[in-house]
Amino acid sequence: MSLWFLVFLSVLQGVTELFPVSSLGHTLLVPALFGMHIDKHAPQLLPFLVALHLGTALALLWYFRARWIALIGGFFAQLGGRKNDDGHLMWALIIGTIPTGIVGLLLEKRIERVFHDLRIVAIALIVNGVLLWLGDRIQRSRAHQAPEKMTFKQAFFVGLAQIGALIPGFSRSGLTMIAGNVAGLTAEKAAEFSFLLGTPIIFAAGVLELPKLFHARDQLADALLGGVLTAIAAYLSVRFLMRYFEGRGRLASFGVYCVIAGVFCLGWFMLHPQPV
């Protein structure tokens, strides 16, 4: 893997993992648009992807470090019988993580095999954009009805939405923000819950494959560089997005991008079919 391609993939992962535009979809579509071939069976690819996931997770942990300390403290306080908002939210995150954790372990590889056609990925990106636009409309219609505290039912509903992100073209952060909007959360609260909810999922995706990273010692330098670049890109992305949604930023903007990008990619790959 050339240095510039390594940098390109690392930054692409760090940005698109958190922006509601589908990191997996972009990782498949963008290189193909530029004629770059990614060998999924290359021995150096898996360790590299592991490092990228860990870099993203560490960036999220660092950005929300004070929040996580409060959540963990509240969780143990609640176990001791002292009810508190942080402990409640921690339980909500645990409940929201369960659906994707189970389905991901059972079906992720099968889903990836079915949706490796880039035209299908482009269609999924278009649908993702439409859903973002609809989610934005719903959130704005309920702007003054947001609950003070997320219920466990809402958390489970948002967690179910994460399952859709196993399909390339659908965004994990996008789907969970949409679900949060449908559940009645403000844009800012939906974004925060989405990023907090995604942290254990992204971290687990890296940790489960961590032994393979250490077995590929000759690839550690590339993997380490990729992880660091991804962490920087992810940190800057989450910082921007939280400020964006605090300032009444709209999901619809990302929805428009996804539809335009998806339509362009669909047309391109219809005219230039890729080997399946």
From Swiss-Prot:
Stretches that traverse the bilayer: 1-21, 44-64, 87-107, 114-134, 150-170, 190-210, 222-242, 251-271
Write out the GO MF terms: undecaprenyl-diphosphatase activity
- What does the entry give for GO biological process? cell wall organization; peptidoglycan biosynthetic process; regulation of cell shape; response to antibiotic
Q: What class of enzyme is it?
A: hydrolase
- Where is this chain primarily localised? membrane
Looking at the Swiss-Prot or TrEMBL record, what is one Pfam family this protein matches? BacA
Keyword set, alphabetical order? Antibiotic resistance, Cell inner membrane, Cell membrane, Cell shape, Cell wall biogenesis/degradation, Hydrolase, Membrane, Peptidoglycan synthesis, Transmembrane, Transmembrane helix
Q: Which reaction(s) does its UniProt entry say it catalyses?
A: di-trans,octa-cis-undecaprenyl diphosphate + H2O = di-trans,octa-cis-undecaprenyl phosphate + phosphate + H(+)
Q: What is its EC number?
A: 3.6.1.27
Write down the superkingdom of origin.
Answer: Bacteria
Membrane as UniProt keyword = yes
Could you tell me the membrane topology recorded for this protein? Multi-pass membrane protein
Task: Give the GO cellular component terms, alphabetically.
Answer: plasma membrane
Where found? Cell inner membrane
| Family named by the database record | Belongs to the UppP family.
Other information: Bacitracin is thought to be involved in the inhibition of peptidoglycan synthesis by sequestering undecaprenyl diphosphate, thereby reducing the pool of lipid carrier available.
Q: What is this protein called?
A: Undecaprenyl-diphosphatase 2
Give the species this sequence originates from. Answer: Burkholderia cenocepacia (strain HI2424)
Gene name tied to this protein: uppP2
